[in-house]
UniProtKB/Swiss-Prot annotation:
Xref: NCBIfam families: argG, PRK00509.1
Amino-acid positions noted as binding L-citrulline in the UniProt annotation, renumbered to this chain: 86, 91, 122, 126, 178, 187, 264, 276
CDD domains: ASS
Source taxonomy: Bacteria, Bacillati, Bacillota, Clostridia, Lachnospirales
A GO cellular component entry from the record: cytoplasm
InterPro entries: Arginosuc_syn_C (IPR048268), Arginosuc_syn_N (IPR048267), Arginosuc_synth (IPR001518), Arginosuc_synth_CS (IPR018223), Arginosuc_synth_type_1_subfam (IPR023434), AS_cat/multimer_dom_body (IPR024074), Rossmann-like_a/b/a_fold (IPR014729)
Name of the coding gene: argG
Name of the protein this chain belongs to: Argininosuccinate synthase
């Protein structure tokens, strides 16, 4: 009986070409494993395609709820945004994919896991760090780094290789973007996006929605309810977090919400350009941020922003299965204890407009914040505070004046 390799399989061009390549260069049975994290109709026809390409078996692991509850929600609660723009759509999906690949490898008694990430990208790092953390004894095969046997250097080469092995491709891969999709987002790279000087062809590339210019002229309002930092209802209707994201994707896409054109710094050192659509996620993150502004005290909110940035870096770099991520998440969980309330928003041509926020744990006190005189705050108290708060500035100014006088 042959040993087995588990291939992280999407049915796209790269992983389709890898199946015959593995059979040619390794004496393994190829078991494909597709992890369903909400990519929708991209799963159609996968089993037939995998077997026609030479795989012995295909697993489709449906883990959308697990992905959202255990990976997306911690990022939402942390306010994790990479380089001020990227909501980590691809990054946060990689650890759950690595985890499921390892589980299938153990079930099949496989000796190796293979992935189709290129040698220039982030995903090779994310997949392999996850696999090493969970199953250090498993061999990892990365075809794009196998220079002696992987001779394909472009999508065109892969297309010709597939044709030579009698594999019919269900798409025109030579004229398509490189995309990654899950419930949280879809990314687009390649074609005109390779040159940052080019404007994105939004009419051609957008999948989840429209550009703001083509959004309706009438705004639409919604409300989101949170409990301990987690969304639990949309417009008053109780729903799972995954269902809320799905609904918000439709609403946000309709109004051109969450489209970013970004040049980001990859883990491997180079810059890359892509267009990302995250309509539902953008709405959810904005609502969560607005609720926190009402509830968290100044010191905690300030520290949490720093932790959120670090959390984003850790997730982006593929370090999910580390003590550092666990420690950061533990801090975040404490901050979310009272992040409960309702946020009202209006969507209009790419904009998310605040319409009011309420919480039983709000620290906003109108009697204190109002410009009118109240019992809880005496305007004259500010004088002593300012004298103490500005004491160091006053002392330095006095010293500098003394220095200048003695010159």
């Amino acid at each position: 009986m042959k040993e087995k390799v588990i291939l992280a399989y999407s049915g796209g061009l790269d992983t389709t070409a890898i199946i015959p390549w593995l059979k040619e260069n390794y004496d393994y049975d190829v078991v494909c494993c597709c992890i369903d994290v909400g990519q929708g109709n991209e799963l159609d026809g996968l089993e037939e395609r995998a077997k026609l390409s030479g795989a012995t078996k295909l697993y489709i692991e449906h883990v959308t709820d697990e992905f959202v509850d255990e990976y997306v929600m911690p990022c939402v609660k942390a306010g994790a945004v990479y380089e001020n723009k990227y909501l980590l759509g691809t990054s946060m999906a990689r650890p759950v994919i690595a985890k499921k690949l390892v589980e299938v490898a153990i079930k099949e008694n496989a000796v190796a896991i293979c992935h189709g990430a290129t040698g220039k990208g982030n995903d090779q790092v994310r997949f392999e760090l996850g696999i090493k953390a969970l199953a250090p004894d498993l061999k990892i095969i990365a075809p794009w780094r196998c220079n002696n046997t992987w001779k394909m250097q472009s999508r065109e080469d892969e297309i010709e290789y597939c044709k030579a092995h009698g594999i019919d491709l269900p798409f025109d891969a030579s004229h398509s973007y490189s995309r990654d999709r899950n419930l949280w987002h879809i990314s687009h790279e390649g074609l005109e996006l390779e040159d940052p000087a080019n404007a994105p062809n939004y009419d051609h590339l957008l999948v989840l929605g429209v550009s703001p210019e083509k959004a309706p002229n009438e705004a639409e309002s919604l409300s989101l309810t949170f409990e301990k930092g987690i969304p639990v209802a949309l417009n008053g209707k109780a729903m799972k977090a995954s269902e809320i994201i799905e609904e918000l994707n439709v609403l946000g896409g309709k109004y051109g919400i969450g489209i970013i054109d970004i040049v980001e710094n990859r883990v491997v050192g180079m810059k890359s350009r892509g267009v990302y659509e995250t309509p539902g996620g953008t709405i959810l993150m904005e609502a969560h941020t607005q609720l926190e502004e009402l509830i968290l005290d100044r010191a905690t909110l300030s520290c949490k922003k720093e932790i959120g940035n670090k959390f984003a870096d850790v997730v982006y770099e593929g370090k999910w299965f580390t003590p550092l991520r666990e420690a950061l998440q533990a801090f975040v969980e404490v901050t979310q204890e009272y992040v409960t309330g309702e946020v009202k928003l209006k969507l209009y041509k790419g904009n998310i407009i605040k319409q009011g926020t309420t919480s039983p744990y709000s620290l906003y006190n109108e009697s204190i914040a109002s410009f009118t005189t109240g019992e809880l705050y005496n305007h004259h108290d500010a004088e002593g505070f300012i004298n103490l708060f500005g004491l160091s500035l006053k002392v330095r100014a006095m010293k500098m004046a003394e220095v200048e006088k003695n010159k």
